[in-house]
Amino acid sequence: MLQPKRMKFRKMHKGRNRGLAAGTEVSFGTFGLKAVGRGRLTARQIESARRAMTRHVKRQGKIWIRVFPDKPITAKPLEVRMGKGKGNVEYWVCQIQPGKVLYEMDGVSEELAREAFGLAAAKLPIKTTFVIKTVM
C-alpha cells in the first residue's frame, strides 16, 4: 500500500479540507477519473480501485495514479481513557478537492476505460466523473 518512506514529523493536525484542487487536467493518459466531490481517500481505497481497473483491462494499456496518501491518521486503542497523548498512526489518507484527477489511463478503448473507471468509482467514497483529454 502507498505511504511515505520518510516524514519530518510522524503525526499531523486534522486540518480542514478546503480550497481548490491542483492537478485538474488529464496530463499523462487519454482518459481520466476526476473527483466531483470533496473528501479523503485512504491508501486501501486507492489500491482497491487500482486493482479493480487493472483486472478489468486485463493488464493492457497503462494506468497512472495521480494521488498519494501523505497524511497520517491516528487513533487510540479501544477502551483507553482520554488524555495520555495522541494515538498511534493507523492509516494514511489523501485529501481530495473537487476537480482533482485521481487516475489516468491510456492504450485502451474509450468503452473499456469507462467500464474500468466505473468499477474503480464504486470502490471510492467520493463522487467521480469520466473525463477525456482535450487537445489544444
From Swiss-Prot:
InterPro entries: Ribosomal_uL16 (IPR047873), Ribosomal_uL16_bact-type (IPR000114), Ribosomal_uL16_CS (IPR020798), Ribosomal_uL16_dom (IPR016180), Ribosomal_uL16_sf (IPR036920). GO terms for cellular component: cytosolic large ribosomal subunit. GO terms for biological process: translation. Keywords: Ribonucleoprotein, Ribosomal protein, RNA-binding, rRNA-binding, tRNA-binding. One of its GO terms (molecular function) is tRNA binding. Pfam families: Ribosomal_L16. NCBIfam families: rplP_bact. Part of the 50S ribosomal subunit. Binds 23S rRNA and is also seen to make contacts with the A and possibly P site tRNAs. Belongs to the universal ribosomal protein uL16 family. HAMAP family: Ribosomal_uL16. This is Large ribosomal subunit protein uL16. It comes from Shewanella amazonensis (strain ATCC BAA-1098 / SB2B). The gene is rplP.
